[in-house]
Amino acid sequence: FDLTVPGYFYRQNAGGSYSNASGCGNETASEREMVRHYIIESVKFWAREYHIDGFRFDLMGIHDIETMNHLRSELLEIDPTIFVYGEGWVAADSPLPFEQRAVKENVGQMEGIGVFNDEFRDGLKGSTFDEQEPGYASGNINGHFEPVKYGIVGGTDHPQVDYGGLLYCNAPYAGAPSQMINFVSCHDGYTLVDKLKLSVQGDHAADELIPIDKLV
């Protein structure tokens, strides 16, 4: 991209170096008109020519809300059943103002787009970043009950959820339950059964942990 239009396709810090909200050395500047055009036209091509019926955006928070909403509306014209979702966070800070980022806290401004629910994930199994911390499923009932409830109501406003007891946010952010994707484990971090082995207190045989794994 830089060979095409130097300095245009990637965001820069004040000193001119590449910003790195992706954690991979750079980040595309989706808020710029031709970067936005490239992203949207690429997705439309894949949907039309390859009949792809769902798009997952890694570190979706790098992109701006306007681009994601435009992309969603264009896909609706092709096939209203196409699913759009992503990771509602960034790997590091970005020059893009927080209120413009397509992060989970702003998903209420992105109708028809879903985000992963890391509150429910870590509430149920324990912290992804602390291998020995247990979650609700492994006995940490008091400390992780609210994040589990938050997942049950789909990240929406509900009178039975104490939002002050959440792990990473203090308010509901989904406009509808369909915008919240509950999950427990994925390609990142430990598999669920390995996380249980590390976090469940005491010595437990595999035949004791497997039922917990299946229950979750």
Model-found features: residue ranges?
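Active-site-proximal loop/turn and secondary-structure-junction residues that shape catalytic pockets
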Residues: G61-H63, V90
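Conserved alpha/beta catalytic core and glycan-binding cleft of carbohydrate-active enzymes
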Residues: R72-V216
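Substrate-binding/active-site clefts of carbohydrate-active enzymes
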Residues: F1-Y50, H63, T67-D79, F83
